[in-house]
């Protein structure tokens, strides 16, 4: 076992998601179920994320990621198709001891998220440890 399975309480906790496409959407929808306080940084948003923004379920900054964007999130998710941005997000978060997940890049992650089966009150996460 290379990773320790853990469930984290994100209720009203700040989470930063970098990216505004379909991959980011999937992560954000899971974070919304966890009642996290989500900030999204992206150059553009998919239709569904614009809808969540309109409903004030997410806070959005239409801009490029910068190192100083990492102010107090409890975790960070990079969900962009830009390898340089993903690497910068990972290095910056790790330097600040903020847990970071870079989608589809396990070598840049300090945590991974398993596949989830939610049959409330039963919640099951399954992982191949990034493989």
Regions found by a protein language model. Name each.
Residues 1-52:
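Hydrophobic, well-ordered beta-alpha structural blocks that scaffold small-molecule cofactor pockets
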Residues 12, 71-73, 119:
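Alpha-helix C-terminal capping/helix-to-coil transition sites in glycosyltransferase folds
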Residues 38, 60, 99-100:
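Hydrophobic beta-strand scaffold residues
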Residues 42, 60-64, 104:
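Short loop/edge segments at beta-strand edges and connector loops
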Residues 53, 58, 89-93:
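A generic structural signal for well-ordered alpha-helical segments
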Residues 54-71:
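Glycine-rich, highly charged phosphate/nucleotide-binding loops
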Residues 75-81, 86-111:
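ADP-ribose/adenylate-binding Rossmann-like module
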